[in-house]
Amino acid sequence: MSKLQENIAKAESFLARFKERGVLNRINGEDVSAADGSTFETISPVDLKPLATVARGKAADIDRAAKAAKAAFADWAAMPGDARKKLLHKIADAIVARAEEIAFVECMDTGQSLKFMAKAALRGAENFRFFADRAPEARDGKSIRAEGQVNLTTRVPIGPVGIITPWNTPFMLSTWKIAPALAAGCTIVHKPAEFSPLTARLLVEIAEEAGLPKGVWNLVNGLGEDAGRALTEHSLIKAIGFVGESRTGSMIMKQGADTLKRVHFELGGKNPVVVFADADLERAADAAVFMIYSLNGERCTSSSRLLVEESVYDKFTAIVAEKAKRIKVGHPLDPETVVGPLVHPVHEKKVLEYIQIGRSEGATLAAGGEKVNGPGGGCYVSPTLFTGANNQMRIAQEEIFGPVLTAIPFKDEADALALANDVQYGLTGYLWTSDVTRAFRFTDHLEAGMIWVNSENVRHLPTPFGGVKSSGIGRDGGDWSFDFYMETKNVAFRYRRCSRQGQIGGVDSVGGVAGRVGADQSGGAVCVAVANGERGVGGQRSVDHLAEPT
């Protein structure tokens, strides 16, 4: 038996439960069908065969889940941060224990190759560990002094939140959104994408088996137009974290406006990789190929526009074309596969249509550009490179979200910057140059939320993740995640410094509450009393008291 056959047999054993019992919603710790009994079918992009029947939640199901999240919120928010930390680490341990199952199910549900999905499960565990370690300090604030005033800030969880996750790398991206929400003390209603619902089900059951209380994490499957909309409009849901298309993000903002929803969006991208003639061309080519063709090109941070200095354009694109042609397209469970099938026939059709658009616009196909007859007859598309393109072409302006790279030449630094910024998106950028001064100058003006210099996308969890323009609102990562899931509260103590002699080092009884008086270096009393205008010991007014209100 080959390694591929062995992996397929394992995958079938992991998927058997879904084929037999389907995928139910999980609300308040219970498996439940949709309120009206509706279902939909999820298929594998490998062979287009059904994987499971999935409960199709709608407004009634979202309402039930939101009420469960609301009921669980007070106790979960009140749990000490150290206790939440321990529980989130238990969830991470449980993810690691089931990492193979998660990876194999994700491969068959999304078409992503095992080469990358084996790591994605472990990255999901690391997301939980990272935010678990920060849970005890999540509420910590600052002490801010002003003349006559001390301000103390703290943070409190915002309440029940909605999490809407995409079909690309759904397990890892779900952990990226859910782990900080739980660490902050929020309860959640999670609606995964309908194209890839299976690992979301694994994740919620892993969390509850690790000890997460009922109602803290609720899962409702369904379509965007019913379950998604009901979630974004529900009055008990205080915020929405969403990863997906920019157009959908705009719709969510409109739907949440009546209830003044806080929103955090990670949206589309048309990210440039800018290669100057002085760059290490071989390293830059490897990085460009990795950032567009890994994960099937179905990633928000993919470098889908290749901007190359004219003097090395032909040489560099030839290197990239040769590397693209050598990429193995195949079954996602084959250990050698880099590019597997695209997630769904609907998406495959979109990608193939864009390839035809590029050809009709006059761009040259230097590699790929065709449907591949892969194992199982699924949604396979070859790694594609367009050369001879310009920035006005649709393939250079619109997000394709597949293994399609568009290469455009530039004259000089100013031209490169103008081309890089001339799109509606601004998620990431990649810059390759040996000139450090140029790198600082260029990144200062590149319109992107994240930029990597002489590197592919290498994430460091404490750093901010997010885009500008049509690529998103807000930042994930580090403390930025807590800023979204928590409200900041300020408490101001107003006082005034006194210089008169009297009761130095004594104790005033103010309204029955003791307030100690200390001495400053000039011999005058300095204190913060707890009330204004009350009598002190022996009926005398306290020397120091709260200042008059402003």
Name these PLM-found stretches.
Residues 49-53, 237, 274, 328-329, ...:
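Conserved C-terminal structural/oligomerization subdomain of aldehyde/semialdehyde dehydrogenase
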Residues 96, 139-283, 410:
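Rossmann-like NAD(P) dinucleotide-binding subdomain of oxidoreductase/dehydrogenase enzymes
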Residues 1-45:
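Hydrophobic face of amphipathic alpha-helices that form TPR/SEL1-like repeat modules
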Residues 49-138, 148:
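Glycine-rich loop-to-alpha-helix module at the N-terminal edge of alpha/beta enzyme cores
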Residues 50-57, 72-78, 162-163, 273-276, ...:
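Short, well-ordered beta-strand elements within core beta-sheets of diverse protein domains
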